[in-house]
Amino acid sequence: MPYVTRGWRAGLTAAAAATLAVGVLTAAAAAPASTGQPGTGQSGTGRSSTARAGIADTHPAWATASARTSSQPVTSGTVSARVYLAGQDPAGLASYATAVSTPGNALYGHYLTTGQVMARYGPTQVQVSAVSSWLTGAGLSVTAVKDEIGGYVAVQGSVRAAARAFGVTFGTFRGPDRRADRAPEQTASAPAGVASAVLTVTGLDTATHDMTPADTLPPPGPNYWVAPPCSTYYGQKIAVREPSAYGAKQPWTNCGYTPHQIRGAYHVAQSGMTGKGVTVAIVDAYASPTMLSDANQYAKVTGDQPFAAGQYTQDLASTFTDAAADECDAPGWYGEQTLDVEAVHGMAPDANVVYVGAASCTDQDLGDALALIVDNHLASIVSDSWGEPADLTSELPVYEEIFQAGAAEGIGFFFSSGDSGYENPSEDPGSDMQQTDFPAESPYVTSVGGTSLAIGRSNNYEFETSWGSVLDPLAANHRSWRSTPPGQWPAGYDGSGGGGVSYDFAQPSYQQGVVPNRLATALPNGSTSPTPMRVEPDVSAVADPSTGILVGQTTLQPNGTTYAFSLSRIGGTSVSVQIFAGIEADAQQAAGHPLGFANPVIYERYGTSAFHDVTNHPFGSRKLAEVRSNYTNPDTKTGPLVTYLRTLGIDGEGTAALPAVKGYDDATGVGSPAWYIQSFQ
C-alpha cells in the first residue's frame, strides 16, 4: 500500500473490467470459475468446491526472482488485508457511467441517486456473508465491513492463515522502497464459488510502513520565500544586467499570479460566472489547522472575497496516521490543501467548498475519502492534486468503481497529470520505468496537465506553452550562462507536466477521432500497441512554478520559532487541476445543471474557441526563456542569490519527450481554457 505523492502521483494497478465504450483494462482479472450464487458452493461450470479462480494484480510486479532477498519462505508474522467486493453488476455500472456522461445518448444527464446506485450496483449482504465465511474459515478474523461503493471485508490474521485463504506462499523481495518486503509469490486466488464477489485484494505485501494508531499532527513547516527581482505580470521587468539568451535579454519570472489575473487570462471574469450553487470537494491527506483563516486572509490580500459563513466545510478522518516526515509528511500536505482550497475559491468565489481530509496519504485512505464523497454525494466536482506511477499498487479496480459510481451520480473527478513528465527514471527517481500516472490515466477522470502562462499588464492572455523547463546557471564570471542554452538535460531538468500513453486502459470512445492513432498506439517502452490506448492529459492550465500562483499560508518564520501568515509562489499540476476544477464549477453554473464526468463534453469542444491550442513554440522558431533568482536557503531567506536561465517548452527529451503540437497532444491535451465557460451559456 504505497504512499501517494502530493501534486502529481497515485497509482494503482489493473484488474477486472468489462469491455466498455469508455475504456477497458488491458490486464483483465481472471474470469470467475463459477457462475453460481457467491458463497453457496454451487458452480455454474460444474467445478468442485475446491476449484479456485485467480484474483488479478495481487502478485506485485516488483516481486520477481531477481528481486528475491531470501530463499526461505515467510511463514510467520501478521497480515492485515482488505478483500474488496465486486458489487452486483460491474459491467452495467461502467456502461451506465459512459452513457449518462455522453451527449447524444438517450441516458445523458439522467443521473442516479446514491440509493439507486447502491441498489443497482453496490455489494449485497450475500456477497459480504460469502466472503466473510471464506476468510474466517481459513483462520482470518474479520475486523471491518463496508457494504457501500468501494465496499470491502477487512481481515487480520497470521501469515499461515492468509496463505490458506488466498492460496499463496509468501517470500521476501526488494520492494519499490528498496527495503526487504514481504509479498505473495503467486497470484492470489479465491474459491470458485466466491470469486465473482471479489474485486481485488490489498494488503498482502508490506511495501510501506505499518499504520500507527493515531498520530498527533505536527505544526506547519517553513515558507518558501520568493527571491527578488520578480515581475507582477509577464515582461514587466527585464534582466538587463544578466547575459542574453537566444539573441535577446530575457524577462524576470513573475512573483506569483493572483486569482484575479488568472480569471482574466482564461476569460472567467468575462463570463460573469462565479460557481454559485455548485459544490466542489477537495481531497488531500490530513488537515491544516489554519485553513479557513489562511484562505480568508489570502482573499483579502489578493483583492477577493473571503468565504461566507458555511461556504467552506470540512469532513475529516476520525484519526490521522503516518504523519511523520519519513512517511506522509503531514506539513507538506497542509500546503497542498491550502493551495487547493485557495485556487478553487479564486476561480469560483461563490462555489461551496468541502474539504475531505484522508487519514493518511496511502492509496487505501485516499480511496476511502473518495468513496465517502460518492456514498454521500457531497459534491458534483471532485478535485485531486495527487498521484503516483501507475505500476505501484493493486487498488486500481477499487478506484475505477468509485469513479464509475460517481459518474452515474453526476460527479466529475479531476486529477493532476503529474509533475515529472513521462515518469522516466531520469525525470523521477521514484519511478522504475517510463509510464503515466494513476489516477490521472483513468478513462473515467479528467486529467489536467500543465502549462507556462504569460499574463499581460491588463490581465490579458499573452501566450502559453507546455510546462517543462531546463535550468542553466549563471557562470562564475557572471558574463554568460554556464552552458550553451538551454543547458544540460537531465541535470538541468526542472520539472514538467505529466502525460503519455497508458499501458492499462484502452482508448475511450471520447478520444476517438481526436487523439491521433500514431500517438495512441506508441507505448512508453517504445513498442507499438495493436490497438489505441488511453492518452493523457485531457486539458491543461497554468502549472509552471515560475509562472505560478500566489498562495498564502501560516508557516514557520525564518527565525525558526514563530508562525505567521506568509505568501509564496507555487506551481505544479497541483495548481492546474484546481484552476480547471474551479472553472468547471463556473461552467456548471453557466449550464444550469451538473456536468458530471466531463471528458465527453470536453472532447466535444475540441478545436473550438473553448480552448487555447497550446504548443511548445507559440512564436515559431523563437525560443522562450525567463531569468529566475532563488535564495540559497529559501526557507530562511538567507544565502547569496542564485540566478538561472529557464528555457520553457521542454517537456522531456528523447524517448521521454512529451511535445506540445498543433491539435491534441500528450503534454497539454485539447488545450487550456479560453471561452470554455461561455460555450455553456
Give each language-model segment a name.
Residues 583:
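Walker A/P-loop NTP-binding active-site region of P-loop NTPases
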Residues 149-151:
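Ser/Thr- and Asn-enriched, surface-exposed coil loops between beta-strands
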Residues 487-516, 605-632:
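Acidic, glycine-rich loop-and-strand cores that form catalytic or ligand-binding grooves
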Residues 47-145, 154, 159-447, 494-571, ...:
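Substrate-binding/charge-relay-adjacent region of secreted/lumenal peptidase catalytic domains
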Residues 441-502:
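Polar, glycine-rich mid-to-C-terminal structural blocks
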Residues 1-36:
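Secretory targeting and sorting signals
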Residues 588-666:
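An often Trp-containing, charged/polar helix-loop segment at the C-terminal end
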Residues 34-50:
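Compositionally biased, intrinsically disordered low-complexity segments enriched
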